[in-house]
């Protein structure tokens, strides 16, 4: 095998990558949590070129993300964490849209308004599927690399390492049929 797909994060991810590095095991690690707080710092150099993440966002995606990253870092200059969960921005913006559309905070009206709701995000359009309430957004595959390498403008956790985009999957390309039979209130 040349790759390991793992759900490990935190200390478990760090120990896994470091142990494979020490053992000379030449594999890449694909994870959803590779950029989660503490993971890049604890893995360190052992993750360069080998730690890959599949996420909805990372600091070096470009497009409209630079403004968000710069704003976050200027507001929290002493923080070693990073803007990671862009889905929180989407959720809040779409909630505001639903409230404004209905001029109400009634949960049922808001839920109905959010079904099929769209938001023009800083890195592309996102929307909520009506049939199962999934948020659909672009997905990125990225690899941990050294700050300053092509495509790595921002480091994570001020480590001198950041994620470089390997590929982007458009939201529409992630849509699969669903068997969801959601019961909705009247």
Where do the model's predicted regions map?
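Solvent-exposed, acidic/polar segments of extracytosolic/periplasmic ligand-binding ectodomains
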Residues: 118, 122-186
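Extracellular/periplasmic periplasmic-binding protein-like sensory domains
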Residues: 17-91, 99-105, 155-185
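Local beta-strand N-terminus motif with an aromatic residue
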Residues: 1-2, 27
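Active-site-proximal beta-strand/loop segments in catalytic clefts of secreted hydrolases
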Residues: 6-10, 32-35, 54-58, 132, ...
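Catalytic-loop motifs flanking and including active-site residues across diverse enzymes
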Residues: 12, 87-91, 137
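Hydrophobic alpha-helical
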Residues: 3-23
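Short, well-structured alpha-helical segments that form the helix of a local strand-helix-strand
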Residues: 106-123
């Amino acid at each position: 095998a040349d790759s390991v797909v793992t759900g490990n994060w935190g200390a478990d991810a760090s120990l896994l990558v470091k142990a494979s590095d020490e053992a000379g095991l030449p594999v890449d690690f694909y994870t959803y949590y590779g950029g989660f707080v503490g993971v890049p710092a604890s893995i360190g150099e052992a993750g360069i070129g080998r730690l890959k993440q599949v996420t909805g966002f990372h600091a070096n995606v470009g497009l409209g993300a630079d403004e968000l990253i710069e704003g976050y870092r200027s507001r929290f200059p002493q923080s070693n964490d990073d803007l990671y969960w862009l889905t929180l921005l989407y959720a809040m913006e779409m909630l505001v849209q639903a409230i404004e559309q209905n001029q109400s905070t009634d949960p049922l009206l808001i839920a109905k308004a959010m079904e099929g709701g769209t938001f023009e995000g800083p890195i592309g359009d996102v929307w909520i599927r009506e049939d199962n309430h999934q948020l659909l957004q672009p997905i990125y595959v990225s690899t941990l690399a050294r700050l300053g390498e092509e495509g790595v403008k921002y480091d994570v956790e001020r480590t001198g390492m950041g994620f470089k985009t390997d590929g982007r999957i458009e939201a529409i390309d992630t849509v699969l049929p669903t068997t969801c039979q959601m019961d909705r209130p009247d």
